[in-house]
Amino acid sequence: MLRINVCFDASKKVPAKIQQALRAEIEKEILSNYERGVVSVGKGSSAEVSISGVDDDEKKVIMQKLEDIWQSDSWLP
C-alpha cells in the first residue's frame, strides 16, 4: 500500500486550509492511480516528504508528481 507523508516545519505556521488543499490535490493526482493508499499532511519538527510501499523507480515518479503539484498554484485555496 502506498503511503505519502508530507510534514511542514511547525515553525512556518502553514494554515490548515493549505494543508487540507495539498492533501486533496495529492489524493486526486496521485492516489487515484493506486488501488490502496494513504496521504498524511501535517506539521512536524522539520519539513520532509516520505514515500513508502512502492519500489524505488515508482518513488521517483511519485516524487516528481509531488514536485509538480507543489510548483503549481492551481490547488491553493
Swiss-Prot record:
List the GO biological process terms: DNA repair; SOS response
Q: What superkingdom does the record give?
A: Bacteria
| Record's keyword terms, sorted | DNA damage, DNA repair, Plasmid
* InterPro entries for this protein: DinI-like_sf (IPR036687), DNA_damage-inducible_DinI-like (IPR010391)
Family, according to the entry, reads as follows:
Belongs to the DinI family.
Q: What is this protein called?
A: Protein ImpC
The taxonomy runs: Bacteria, Pseudomonadati, Pseudomonadota, Gammaproteobacteria, Enterobacterales
Name of encoding gene: impC
